[in-house]
Amino acid sequence: MADTYEIQRRAMVEGQLRARGIRSAAVLQAMAKIPRQLFVPEAERVNSYINGPLPIGFGQTISQPYIVAYMTEALELRGSEKVLEIGTGSGYQTAILAEIAAQVCTMEVIPELSCGARELLSAVFNYKNVIFKIGRGQEGWPEFAPFDRMILTAAPGQFPEVLFAQLSEGGIIIAPVGGVDQRLVRYSKRVGKIEATDLIGVIFVPLV
């Protein structure tokens, strides 16, 4: 018999994701599988599947389910990619990526969040394709570059161009950019040149 969280998770996938245009079978499957309630503080678990962000401590948030799905779908993952995630946060987006991508390299500047996500993903999910690092995302992770995909879960005022050098040819970056007025932007690399495509308006915590 399905528990309450499982029922809420199914409703989230149908009502918040599929109904709003998320079509990637891999993304929908991952979102239906990962128990979001494990990634939020106990006091917020009753709100785990609402269509909104939730606080996770240290001034950070876990993004609303639709935005997680939208950004993941926009990465156009096929299953063979190495992904750089800047902003591990709770580890929820990390888990979604780990379900689809070949390898996930995830960075977080707040040690407590990085350690908490590492412990959760290791103990509960036993992922073997996730590598963690505590550090500033603006600098990227040159030791593991190049990356086929990158995703930022916090917004820089201006996109750190050093990351473009760490992106593979044909690679894609999905990132919120801006201050008060933020836009989600898709960057793609073709023949060494970067093309930027504006997607939607968003609200993220600033990249620090």
Say what each PLM segment does.
Residues 1-84, 92-96, 100, 113-124, ...:
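Class I SAM-dependent transferase core
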